[in-house]
UniProtKB/Swiss-Prot annotation:
Subunit description: Interacts with ARHGEF28. Interacts (via GTP-bound form) with RIPOR1 (via N-terminus); this interaction links RHOA to STK24 and STK26 kinases. Interacts with RIPOR2 (via active GTP- or inactive GDP-bound forms) isoform 1 and isoform 2; these interactions are direct, block the loading of GTP to RHOA and decrease upon chemokine CCL19 stimulation in primary T lymphocytes. Binds PRKCL1, ROCK1 and ROCK2. Interacts with ARHGEF2, ARHGEF3, NET1 and RTKN. Interacts with PLCE1 and AKAP13. Interacts with DIAPH1. Interacts (in the constitutively activated, GTP-bound form) with DGKQ. (Microbial infection) Interacts with yopT from Yersinia pestis.
Glycosylation sites: Y34, T37
Protein name per Swiss-Prot or TrEMBL: Transforming protein RhoA
Impact after mutating Y34A: Abolishes interaction with DGKQ
Post-translational modification: (Microbial infection) Substrate for botulinum ADP-ribosyltransferase. (Microbial infection) Cleaved by yopT protease when the cell is infected by some Yersinia pathogens. This removes the lipid attachment, and leads to its displacement from plasma membrane and to subsequent cytoskeleton cleavage.
Primary role: Small GTPase which cycles between an active GTP-bound and an inactive GDP-bound state. Mainly associated with cytoskeleton organization, in active state binds to a variety of effector proteins to regulate cellular responses such as cytoskeletal dynamics, cell migration and cell cycle. Regulates a signal transduction pathway linking plasma membrane receptors to the assembly of focal adhesions and actin stress fibers. Involved in a microtubule-dependent signal that is required for the myosin contractile ring formation during cell cycle cytokinesis.
Length: 193
């Protein structure tokens, strides 16, 4: 039986952990050096609820320089992973400010999973000290859940690509969301206008 194919696009601020999350899930290795993404694709097979799914993983660049290029990733998307970093409250702030409007414009009706990356840094002393200097603290789980409700996300997950904690669960939830997505008579995927 042929696998069902679904397209997943990951978005979020630059350096919030998008590429690491995809690489750990698809290749099971954590990249130690940071290289800003322009456009990368990976494919991974996943089984959920007895269904074999081939996930096409589309990585995107979060940097503003790529705001005009990123929409090329959106057509025919089945599910969006919208990421922020738990060690960066500013990246959470950009979820409603930047990422939700962009995604809802290009991908109306496509389910969104809100993902808090770098969960391992929430209790990291160095991270807490650095944030305290700016009168900030790591994002709390309830702040992530509240944001997911606010933007109408399908769900909220937290993970650490570094420790692999929660990584598989993120993609299981995303796959379920992609499989459940209601398709109207017309294909209701993303549009580029």
């Amino acid at each position: 039986m042929a696998a069902i194919r679904k397209k997943l696009v990951i978005v979020g601020d630059g350096a919030c952990g998008k590429t690491c999350l995809l690489i750990v899930f698809s290749k099971d290795q954590f990249p130690e050096v940071y290289v800003p993404t322009v456009f990368e694709n990976y494919v991974a097979d996943i089984e959920v609820d007895g269904k074999q799914v081939e996930l096409a993983l589309w990585d995107t660049a979060g940097q503003e320089d790529y705001d005009r290029l990123r929409p090329l990733s959106y057509p025919d998307t089945d599910v969006i992973l919208m990421c922020f970093s738990i060690d960066s409250p500013d990246s959470l702030e950009n979820i409603p400010e930047k990422w939700t409007p962009e995604v809802k414009h290009f991908c109306p009706n496509v389910p969104i999973i809100l993902v808090g990356n770098k969960k391992d840094l929430r209790n990291d002393e160095h991270t807490r000290r650095e944030l305290a200097k700016m009168k900030q603290e790591p994002v709390k789980p309830e702040e992530g859940r509240d944001m997911a409700n606010r933007i109408g996300a399908f769900g909220y997950m937290e993970c650490s690509a570094k420790t692999k904690d929660g990584v598989r669960e993120v993609f299981e939830m995303a796959t379920r969301a992609a499989l459940q997505a209601r398709r109207g008579k017309k294909k209701s995927g993303c549009l580029v206008l």
